[in-house]
């Protein structure tokens, strides 16, 4: 006999209690019991349709359900737009690209959220008859991937990148990319992503590389890309330039010790100190305040505010540098804050962005005293000479951060009156968001993209139709980067810049698609017979190539069929953290290079955090592999994964301890469908998503509820089911469940159009569990299970047959339509159950997949609208029932027929 309370919920007399909310994390260890694993043992060749004629297992098992289906879908080409031959097809397209995951490692739950959301949108449109294209891909992730490979080589073989030639090192990176890329694609398949694998795209594939080169050359030819010496953000650990957007500013309220890559001990930051420069040719001195005393070796001036009465007498005079013996002019500029420190500031144009602008206005020289590796350079001078002491340079191998105390000591010895002020109100310390490396402003020749004109052009074409109504988000969308974008990186892994140093009497740089093109072009232009061109060794910023993804993945710059049919994309769905890194750059580059926006809409989702609300980080031990949730994993295996990673010993201990606390018994097997449904059940916009395994486990229980429902349904269905439209007069509760089905379809329809997937999942869960199982099935169960002999005894055979026919027909259609509604979220279990249900349907559908069946829409169910039905007795019950659902607990009364 079918047991509705299949999850062992407490049964009170005459009442079933069902909790709508997810279980708490504390309940997880109590409620989870290891389930018997059931294996699909049929000898089905890969890519062949699964055999659903086998007996339905007694309980739900993800491993059984999820076997074979994906291989069949993929081999049959159900995910390709060429599949657009459905009877219900419409003349519309729906296209989007998956935000290409970095090949730095495997996917985490944040990626799983992206897949769950995008696949739900894609599968629904495909079922609606749209011609759908969803392209998979991976990003080469220059800085991140090179760093990971360098760590691996150092850990495994004790070798640094500098021990390899560029060609040898790139061979190691490609080896890493191939391993990681395959694993990422395996994860995407296990997540059920209905991607068109025949169009998979990697950002360093030959075709994509041609697109990158073409984009660079076109932008260079139009003057939007140029090479110039400028003050850039420099990572001393990477020895590379970094774009402004990759720099985080951490606020320091005073003296702070920070860990910096390349240093064993923490380095002091946030201490303001004051020292005095002696006036040249006059008695007195000018005291300046700074948090960077080591950069005073590159000072070229002292600046004061023109209206500051304290310094009126020294305008135009000079100070003498105590170490380098240079004369420093005292200049006036309104940018100086009279209230900060002494009101006089040292000017170091080569190591401070504000000072760089001062040097432009006042024609000051720029002296670089810190090298690209973070060490002091020879131009610091023989700065102890004024004391007639032995010559002591700032050794080149001595890191600048450790030099502060030495400089301060010497300043005191030279009577420059050093005063420490530890109570600094606030200071913004720039650091690289990826590694925590302190960013050093350095003067370097780099390649830049001029963004101002592109940003204006994008805004003029109403660059996006915002999906959000809040003013904050609307303003955020319009904050396109207007400062010039540094796109050159001093790395080995990435797209080598298609620019060439051309040697002739006066050397110059020019861009070109190939070196042959450059030599030919320059020969014609200049007239020299022998020209030697040397390729620029730098590579492009990863975000430059990623910004081309929406059209480069379709074959641009060639006018391919895909580009003509599927560009621009229907929607871009991505994490809210990528709006400036990726979204803004795609908008500018797409508008400039293709003349139109790369997508019509943008949908942003929040970040996934752990159940404590913490950002997921490998060093915290809370990064979860989606496959570990799908298959289940022991604590021991989780700990092994941490040991196999690149964490340092201290971080490894922290991560392993966190795992022991959060997953004392490991992670139970939840399955793909449960994970996807749990992720889509969260509101995507607004606050970040705090996900716990217990929430996913609750969704696995829902899968079991679906399984048991179908098991019961298959047990009561006859050979053929009567279509609902031909039933004629039906019972009031039958009409009620039909109206609930219509309302659910209408609610899903509306929520899908506004991308509120949490509303869709909530409506589907509520209908299946509360309306269908807890009310309708409990009501019709006596009719469906009553034997014909009993009906004869009660002389009610005709009435019994009629009631049974109505109940089975309505039950079939409710279950079948619910499976179709749930299919975009739970593709595996819905396919398994739907295929088993179809032989009992009207006319027995052909052997087609559920993912290509028409998606239910309210216009097809207009006869089931409440206004078309009359059920006064049930109306009151429905109102009470829905009110109880609102209070998070449903009390389903076991009642006799309502008339």
Question: Can you annotate each of these PLM segments?
Answer:
Residues 2, 14-307, 331, 348-361, ...:
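N-terminal, positively charged nucleic-acid-binding surface of large information/translation enzymes
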Residues 2-91, 133, 689-690, 749-758, ...:
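Basic, alpha-helical terminal appendages of large translation-related enzymes
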Residues 110-122, 129, 138-139, 203, ...:
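Structured ligand/cofactor/substrate-binding pocket environments in proteins
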Residues 143, 148-151, 155-159, 172, ...:
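Long, charged, mostly alpha-helical binding arms that flank functional sites
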Residues 238, 324, 435, 503-505, ...:
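Short Cys/His-rich metal-coordination motifs, predominantly Zn2+-binding knuckles/fingers
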Residues 250, 254-285, 483-488, 495, ...:
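Flexible, glycine/threonine-enriched loop-and-boundary segments that flank and lead into catalytic domains
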Residues 518-524, 889:
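Intrinsically disordered, low-complexity terminal segments enriched in Ser/Thr
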């Amino acid at each position: 006999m079918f047991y509705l309370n299949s999850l062992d919920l407490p049964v009170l007399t005459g009442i079933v209690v069902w909790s709508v909310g997810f279980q708490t994390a504390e309940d997880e260890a109590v409620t989870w019991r290891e389930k018997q694993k059931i294996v699909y043992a049929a000898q089905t060749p890969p890519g062949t349709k699964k055999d659903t004629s086998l007996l339905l297992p007694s309980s739900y098992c993800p491993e059984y359900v999820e076997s074979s289906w994906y291989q069949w879908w993929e081999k049959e080409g159900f995910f390709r737009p060429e599949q657009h031959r459905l009877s219900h097809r419409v003349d519309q397209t729906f296209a989007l690209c998956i935000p290409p995951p970095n090949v730095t490692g495997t996917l985490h739950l944040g990626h799983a959220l992206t897949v769950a959301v995008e696949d739900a949108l894609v599968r629904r449109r495909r079922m609606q008859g749209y011609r759908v294209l969803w392209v998979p891909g991976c990003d080469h992730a220059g800085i991140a991937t090179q760093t990971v490979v360098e760590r691996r080589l150092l850990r495994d073989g004790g070798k640094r990148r500098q021990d390899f030639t560029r060609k040898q090192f790139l061979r190691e990176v490609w080896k890493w990319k191939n391993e990681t890329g395959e694993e990422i694609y395996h994860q995407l398949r296990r997540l059920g992503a209905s991607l068109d694998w025949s169009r998979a795209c990697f950002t360093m594939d030959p075709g994509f590389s041609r697109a990158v080169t073409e984009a660079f050359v076109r932008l260079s030819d139009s003057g939007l890309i140029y090479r110039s010496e400028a003050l850039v953000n420099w990572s001393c650990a990477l020895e590379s330039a970094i774009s402004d957007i990759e720099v985080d500013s951490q606020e320091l309220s005073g003296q702070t010790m920070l860990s910096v890559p390349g240093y064993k001990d923490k380095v002091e930051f946030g201490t303001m100190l004051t020292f005095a420069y002696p006036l040249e040719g006059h008695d007195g001195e000018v005291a300046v305040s700074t948090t960077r005393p080591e950069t005073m070796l590159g000072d070229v001036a002292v600046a004061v505010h023109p209206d500051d009465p304290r310094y009126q007498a020294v305008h135009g005079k000079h100070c003498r540098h105590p170490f380098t013996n240079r004369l420093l002019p005292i200049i006036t500029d309104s940018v100086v804050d009279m209230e900060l420190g002494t009101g006089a500031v040292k000017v170091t144009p080569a190591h401070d962005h504000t000072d760089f602008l001062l040097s432009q206005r006042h024609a000051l020289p720029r002296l670089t005293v810190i090298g690209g590796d973070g060490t002091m350079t020879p131009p610091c001078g023989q700065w102890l000479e004024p004391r007639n002491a032995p010559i002591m340079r700032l050794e080149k191998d001595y890191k600048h951060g450790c030099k502060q105390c030495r400089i301060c000591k010497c300043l005191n010895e030279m009577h420059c009156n050093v005063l420490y002020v530890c109570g600094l109100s606030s200071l913004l310390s720039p650091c690289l968001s990826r590694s925590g490396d302190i960013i050093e402003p350095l003067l370097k020749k780099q390649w830049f993209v001029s963004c101002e004109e592109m940003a204006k052009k994008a805004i003029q074409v109403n660059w996006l139709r915002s999906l959000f109504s809040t003013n904050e988000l609307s303003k955020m969308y319009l904050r396109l980067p207007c400062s010039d974008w540094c796109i050159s990186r001093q790395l080995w892994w990435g797209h080598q810049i298609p620019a060439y140093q051309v040697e002739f009497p006066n050397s110059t740089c020019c861009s070109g698609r190939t070196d042959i093109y450059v030599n030919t072009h320059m020969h014609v232009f200049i007239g020299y017979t022998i020209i030697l061109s040397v390729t620029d060794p730098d590579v492009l910023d990863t975000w430059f190539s990623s910004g081309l993804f929406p059209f480069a993945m379709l074959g641009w710059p060639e006018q391919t069929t895909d580009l003509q049919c599927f560009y621009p994309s229907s929607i871009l769905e991505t994490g809210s953290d990528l709006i400036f890194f990726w979204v803004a750059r795609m908008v500018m580059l797409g508008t400039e290079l293709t003349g139109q926006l790369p997508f019509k809409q943008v949908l942003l989702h929040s970040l996934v955090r752990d159940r404590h609300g913490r950002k997921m980080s490998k060093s915290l031990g809370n990064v979860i592999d989606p496959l570990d949730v799908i298959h289940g994993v022991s604590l021991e295996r989780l700990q092994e994964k941490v040991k196999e990673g690149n964490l340092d010993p201290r971080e490894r201990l922290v991560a392993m301890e966190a795992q022991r606390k959060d997953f004392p018994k490991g992670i139970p097997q939840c399955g793909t469908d449960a994970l996807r449904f749990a992720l889509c059940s969260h509101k995507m916009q607004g606050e970040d998503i705090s996900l716990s395994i217990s929430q996913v486990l609750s969704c696995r229980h829902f899968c079991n509820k679906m399984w048991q429902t179908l098991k019961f349904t298959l047990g009561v269905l006859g050979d053929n089911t009567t279509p609902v439209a031909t039933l004629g007069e039906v019972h009031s509760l039958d009409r009620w469940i039909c109206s609930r089905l219509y309302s659910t379809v209408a609610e899903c329809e509306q929520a899908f159009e506004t991308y509120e997937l949490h509303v869709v999942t909530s409506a589907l869960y509520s209908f299946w569990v509360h309306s269908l199982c807890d009310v309708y099935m409990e009501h019709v169960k006596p009719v469906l299970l009553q034997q014909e002999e009993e009906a004869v005894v009660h002389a009610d055979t005709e009435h019994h047959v009629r009631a049974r026919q109505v109940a089975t027909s309505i039950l079939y259609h409710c279950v079948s339509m619910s499976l179709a509604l749930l299919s975009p979220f739970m593709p595996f279990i819905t396919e398994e159950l739907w295929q088993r249900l179809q032989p009992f349907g009207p006319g027995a559908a052909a052997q087609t997949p559920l993912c290509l069946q028409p998606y239910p829409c309210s216009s097809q169910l207009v006869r089931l609208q409440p206004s078309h039905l009359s059920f006064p007795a049930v109306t009151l019950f429905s109102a009470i029932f829905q009110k109880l659902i609102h209070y998070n607990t449903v009390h389903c009364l076991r009642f006799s027929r309502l008339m």
